[in-house]
Amino acid sequence: MRDEQGGGGSDDFTVQNSIPRAPNMAADDNIDCHNRNSSFSATSPAALYDQGRLSGEGSPMMMSPWNQTACSPFTKSACWSSSGFEDEAFATNAAGAMQNTLIGSLVREEGHIYSLAASGELLYTGSDSKNIRVWKNLKEFSAFKSSSGLVKAIIVSDRKIFTGHQDGKIRVWKVSPKAPNIHKRAGTLPTLKDIFKSSINPSNYIEVKKKRTALWIKHADAVSCLSLSEDGGLLYSASWDRTIKVWRLSDSKCLESIKAHDDAVNFVVAAADGLVFSGSADGTVKVWRRDSLGKSSAKHSLAETLLQQECAVTSLAADKAASIVYCGSSDGLVNHWERTKDKFSHGGVLRGHKLAILCLAAAGPLLMSGSADKTICVWRREGAIHTCLSVLTGHNGPVKCLAVEVDPASAKSGGGSDQRWIVYSGSLDKSVKVWRVSELPADVGHAAAAALPRFDEDSLPGSDGSQASSARRDSHNKRV
């Protein structure tokens, strides 16, 4: 098989003064540039919602940030960072004030961003241009191209990179031991050898559509998500073909194909204790348990169905210990469950977005939610209560993917009470933005809190999420 490879970053960037909008994306006349160096900070939550009314109590979290103003994210180069900007952000945080700020913006005139993966100093981005680009310190470090179409998912395991594509293929790439900026294609999942061996036996074919059969080890539709098991030995792939497939990375074998849902599987998350969570366009969130934990084989059984609703489940996230699970839906709501022993109990609903939740990322006590309304909400969990710390604004299109890493500067200093995270957000506006986010809550005085606006609870869904206003109706395609 011929190797596809990429070298160092090229210099064919297009100098631009505006970020192109995604197709059919209306212009937002409320975006206003008012800051020097085209940099901007997160919108203060105090300006958006009543901080005293918490989502855990079933009250509206905040007014939609749809009409909030923010400085334009327009850049004058393909890779931008503001000199001195980072030092100012550090100083603000060191002074004890919560300041979630934009560090930089990565823009390339080639495609909408559908997938992200952060690994140490490197950031991998996938788009509908078929390119996978690698960034280091806000600069393009490498690039490689696949012939498999839109890159819907990326995950990194040691020196291997796995990419899931719209055409149902999973590509495997290796980093060259001699040159870290060179990536070579190492194969596909399933391997050609396994495809040939399986095709001989008629019992290996299953019906995927009316009058259409395919090998059970192959996905018959787009690969929507990839996730690694806790021990790194298994790879889970979710697909629009309604299945989840389980791969053993040591020999690239497909161990199991789970008929998981009645519609497209949009997300899969592997967590601790052999638990696997899946969310689907059929409106359900399911918990699967790996029966043969610690063995070379893998069999999974359905342990629990957490949610069943009319709206599509469009995103999932869980902490490493699987103690809390988050689910985002096409109605703009985020449900969450807490684990007690072997059972999950519904913890509440987070209401911070006007349109569909397209991505979620959990980091420590924080949850980041990205939406089709172009914003990212930063939530902090304290016990059963979630508070919105800030709303990150600046994208000019739906926020499609998120990735989070510990801020290196925060890690060196030991973190302390002000642990900070680097958040990457990819959008259909063809840009990736890099944010510094603090775990510290905003310091809102009593006088400021008294002046915060109040909202009519009847205009938003009930605490059980059963009634939706026109602003929160199903706002996105069920498949993501």
What residue ranges belong to the model's regions?
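A short helix->beta-strand "capping" segment at the edge of beta-propeller domains
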Residues: 85-109, 136-139, 203-215, 301
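Canonical WD40 repeat/beta-propeller blade segments in eukaryotic WD-repeat proteins
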Residues: 110-116, 149-155, 196-199, 212-228, ...
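Structural hallmark of WD40 beta-propellers
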Residues: 121-124, 142, 159-162, 232-236, ...
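WD40-repeat beta-propellers
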Residues: 132-136, 170-174, 238, 244-248, ...
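Short C-terminal beta-strands that terminate individual repeats in beta-propeller domains
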Residues: 103-108, 141-146, 185-191, 214-218, ...
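Terminal intrinsically disordered, low-complexity extensions flanking WD-repeat/beta-propeller proteins
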Residues: 1-58, 62-63, 68, 183-211, ...
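Conserved strand-to-loop turn within each blade of WD40 beta-propeller repeats
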Residues: 126-129, 164-167, 222, 231, ...
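Short loop/turn segments immediately following beta-strands, especially the blade-tip
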Residues: 174-181, 289-297, 338-342, 380-384, ...
